[in-house]
Amino acid sequence: MRKVSYLFWLTALLGLGLVACAPAAAPEGGPLQEVGEGEGSLSIVAWAGYIERGVTDPGFDWVTDFEAATGCLVQDKVAATSDEMVALMTEGGFDLVTASGDASNRLISAGLVQEINLDLIPSYNTVDERLKNAPWHTVDRDGDGTAEHYGVPYQWGSNVLMYNTEVFTEPPTSWNVVFEETTLPDGQSNAGRIEAYDGPIYIADAALYLMYHNPELGIQDPYELTRDQFNAALDLLRVQRGLVNRYWHDVVLQVDDFTNEGVVASSSWPYQVNLLAVDQPVSSVITVEGATGWADTTMMHTNAPHPNCAYKWLEHSLNTQLQGDLAYWFGSVPSVPAACDTNEMLGPTGCDVNGLGNFEQISFWKTPSAACGFDPAGDAGPNDCVPYHEWVTNMIAVIGGR
């Protein structure tokens, strides 16, 4: 049974519309210059599993000690997709958001997040050099030749191919098991036994697959697609639609589908893999085509109601204990490499298992825009790529059977 929340998509579209017309304003007076006494509260929009206080599992809690040390009581709002995060930040009332690259630049350009004063975050110098000045959270908005920072790296990782190890006695080598009808190793078709992510950014997964298998399309970046390349990705997704059991964005539902509904292969996050692998025959792999992925940044709302508590959390978020525990819990890679060396849960090989060496294989999420960063075949101009709002409307159409 295919299920889609059209109310969710309506919310996402409204968020996009509001973002398009929101003023690109900075907080009055610029970034905070000194961290003062906490305001007593802190609200964070986050991915599932990112803000843990020992409720899901008593062994994973990086909130309670922070609250005791700062007096800042943490409330978190779980968002299922980047579009939901943008919509919530547009609505306002939140302090921080753990934004992926397909949301972070939209938040910056819309003026919904503020520049961060790195002088107030002493642990920033411990961040992975590959992430410190990444383009998904640094922008030279004032044109002075120096990029401003709009967030603090949190965790990164890949969108993996999760599979049932009783069906696949050997790891799948290609994403074809979820994109094209095929007979699986157990002798049965994959039709009705796979899932796909329902976010518009998933079009990039189809483009990445075509980039490997159809090089004549000239795809160089799965987020920078000319009209013909974009249409080819949509055609592949329409084929996939006939195979999909469910389009997922709710991690709990996906866990249940692999446990009880006969789903045996899907794009997923390491978080679901870790939850399922405790008592289900589940594993994951990055295939020959590579994978899309996320590098998440904690960003601060322009009108954050609790800025002092927010800065205290930004510093706390880089604590090696938090970074390592979260990486073990979520199946991600810490933004602070030292966490890989000192965390008991991760052990000496935990970061390697979670994909520390896969950085170059990952096409990290970013917001598609009309401006291309290349000139494929010499005939696609600098503004000939399909912008994100068309990714949204076309993904809705694909899911709806059009």
Segments and roles (model prediction):
Residues 95-99, 247, 264-269, 284:
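Paired acidic/hydrophobic, glycine-rich loop segments that form the ligand-binding mouth/hinge
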Residues 29-110:
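Early extracytoplasmic/lumenal segment of secretory-pathway proteins
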Residues 43-58, 93, 98-253:
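Extracytoplasmic ligand-binding site segments that recognize negatively charged/polar headgroups
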Residues 103-106, 267-281:
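A ligand-binding cleft/hinge motif common to bilobed small-molecule-binding domains
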Residues 296, 301-370:
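Mature extracytoplasmic/periplasmic domains
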Residues 1-42, 402:
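Short, low-complexity disordered leader/linker segments with a strong preference
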Residues 123-126, 234-240, 278-302, 347, ...:
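Periplasmic-binding protein-like
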Residues 256, 362-402:
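Conserved C-terminal helix/tail region of periplasmic/extracytoplasmic solute-binding proteins
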